[in-house]
Amino acid sequence: MIEPILLGIVLGMVVVTLAGLFVAAYRQYQRSNKIGL
C-alpha cells in the first residue's frame, strides 16, 4: 500500500511542477508575442 503522506507529497510536487511549467510557457509566449508585434 502507498502511504497517504507519501502520496500527498508526490501529488503536490507534480501539481507544483506542472503549474511552474505552465507559467513559464505562458510568460515565454507573451514575451514572443510582444516581440513579434
Swiss-Prot record:
List UniProt keywords, sorted A-Z: Electron transport, Membrane, Photosynthesis, Thylakoid, Transmembrane, Transmembrane helix, Transport
Q: Extract the InterPro entries matched here.
A: Cyt_6/f_cplx_su5, Cyt_6/f_cplx_su5_sf
- Give the principal location in a single coarse category: membrane
Localization recorded for this chain is:
Cellular thylakoid membrane
Q: Does the keyword Acetylation apply?
A: no
One GO cellular component term = cytochrome b6f complex
Could you tell me the membrane topology recorded for this protein?
A: Single-pass membrane protein
Q: Which domain of life is it from?
A: Bacteria
Q: Which residues cross the membrane?
A: 5-25
Q: Is 4Fe-4S one of the keywords UniProt gives this record? A: no
BP terms from Gene Ontology: cytochrome complex assembly; photosynthesis
What would be one Pfam family of this protein? PetG
An example of a GO molecular function for this protein is: electron transporter, transferring electrons within cytochrome b6/f complex of photosystem II activity
**Job of this protein:** Component of the cytochrome b6-f complex, which mediates electron transfer between photosystem II (PSII) and photosystem I (PSI), cyclic electron flow around PSI, and state transitions. PetG is required for either the stability or assembly of the cytochrome b6-f complex.
Cited HAMAP family: Cytb6_f_PetG
Which family does the UniProt entry place this protein in?
Answer: Belongs to the PetG family.
Tell me, how does this one assemble? The 4 large subunits of the cytochrome b6-f complex are cytochrome b6, subunit IV (17 kDa polypeptide, PetD), cytochrome f and the Rieske protein, while the 4 small subunits are PetG, PetL, PetM and PetN. The complex functions as a dimer.
The molecule here is called: Cytochrome b6-f complex subunit 5
- Species, as recorded: Synechococcus sp. (strain JA-2-3B'a(2-13)) (Cyanobacteria bacterium Yellowstone B-Prime)
Which gene is transcribed and translated to give this protein?
A: petG
